């Protein structure tokens, strides 16, 4: 949240030089507050588990957030009860005339599937096109990052030979960037993906600003300068046991997966893993809600300014 100070306080300019968000008394007196409307497009098979993970992060902000869950796959789910979907999810037709402060598009286990072979690929493109005029800021996670880069920037699918799985170290590139406000210089975050995100590719083919990357030069966190879109290539929402569940699932399926990197104590899958990324995940989502959504969204959502083209 911003700090409120007198208009003429000398510290105002000093802090702004460090990109600290300062709200003067004159601005604060005219600020109107209402709950934020955030739409979550949940593409994960285990929807209830994914809901829990994202809602936990969104609840860590002092801002009041109204959540709407969205699904675009009309096929019968094998992992989520139909009753749950019918009771708590809307279809795109239900909300296409509405505006939202924020949109989160989750990952999906589609890393080895060509885009045009994804059953709901046309619907993904429809939602992203719609979001340009109806959403203040959109956050893409993991596979959704790859999909958005293709749809918005025409970048072909980049696929790794082996799955990247584990907890990796990252470093921030812009210490005063709003989305990385309060981050340690280096931090840990989990990855579970076949998608590849070389930082050089992002720099060469987009105008997006890379805010954090891995030691190997993969982009982890990047965003547009107008804050309308942000991308996180890992899974900061994951629970402590999620990577373990994925690993043992693949073992049982006979896929011979590598043990997730830097995850199990002593690299032994029989040991109980611990989450080493919770503070990072909470801070990332708090920053996104505050600086990318709350501070730039109009009080009256009917006055949305479409600028994403």
Curated annotation (Swiss-Prot):
GO BP of this protein: L-methionine biosynthetic process from homoserine via O-succinyl-L-homoserine and cystathionine
Protein's organism: Shigella dysenteriae serotype 1 (strain Sd197)
InterPro entries from the UniProt entry: Class_I_gatase-like (IPR029062), HST_MetA (IPR005697), MetA_family (IPR033752)
Cited CDD domains: GATase1_HTS
Annotated positions binding substrate: 163, 192, 249
NCBIfam families to which the protein is assigned, alphabetical: metA (TIGR01001)
Family: Belongs to the MetA family.
Record's keyword annotation contains Hydrolase: no
EC number: 2.3.1.46
Example of a GO MF term: homoserine O-succinyltransferase activity
Residue numbers marked as site, Important for substrate specificity: 192
Catalysis: reaction(s): L-homoserine + succinyl-CoA = O-succinyl-L-homoserine + CoA
Site (Important for acyl-CoA specificity): 111
Family matches, as Gene3D superfamilies: 3.40.50.880
Stored Pfam families: HTS
GO cellular component: cytoplasm
Subunit structure: Homodimer.
Name of the protein this chain belongs to: Homoserine O-succinyltransferase
Role: Transfers a succinyl group from succinyl-CoA to L-homoserine, forming succinyl-L-homoserine.
Active-site residues, as the UniProt record annotates them: 142, 235, 237
């Amino acid at each position: 949240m911003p700090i409120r100070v007198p208009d003429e306080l000398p510290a105002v300019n000093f802090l702004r030089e460090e990109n600290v968000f300062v709200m003067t008394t004159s601005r604060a007196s005219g600020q109107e507050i209402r709950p934020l409307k955030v739409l979550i497009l949940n593409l994960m098979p285990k929807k209830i588990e994914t809901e829990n993970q994202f809602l936990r992060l969104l609840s860590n902000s002092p801002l009041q957030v109204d959540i709407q869950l969205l699904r675009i796959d009309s096929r019968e789910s094998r992992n989520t009860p139909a009753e749950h979907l019918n009771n708590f999810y809307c279809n795109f037709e239900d909300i296409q005339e509405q505006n939202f402060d924020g949109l989160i598009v989750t990952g999906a286990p589609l890393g080895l599937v060509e885009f045009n072979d994804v059953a709901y690929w046309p619907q993904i493109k429809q939602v992203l096109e719609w979001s340009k005029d109806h959403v203040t800021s959109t956050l893409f996670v993991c596979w959704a990052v790859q999909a958005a880069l293709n749809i918005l920037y025409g970048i072909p699918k980049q696929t790794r030979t082996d799955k990247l799985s584990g907890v990796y170290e990252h470093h921030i590139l812009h210490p005063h960037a709003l989305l990385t406000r309060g981050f340690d210089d280096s931090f840990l975050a989990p990855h579970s993906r076949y998608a590849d995100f070389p930082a050089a590719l992002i720099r060469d083919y987009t105008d997006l600003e890379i805010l954090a990357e891995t030691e190997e030069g993969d982009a982890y966190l990047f965003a547009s300068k107008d804050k309308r879109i942000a991308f996180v290539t890992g899974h900061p929402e994951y629970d402590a046991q999620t990577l373990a569940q994925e690993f043992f699932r693949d073992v049982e399926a006979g896929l011979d997966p590598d043990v997730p990197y830097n995850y199990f104590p002593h690299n032994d899958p029989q040991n109980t893993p611990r989450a080493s990324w919770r503070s990072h995940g909470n801070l990332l989502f708090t920053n996104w809600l505050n600086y990318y959504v709350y501070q730039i969204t109009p009080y009256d959502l009917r006055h949305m300014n479409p600028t994403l083209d």
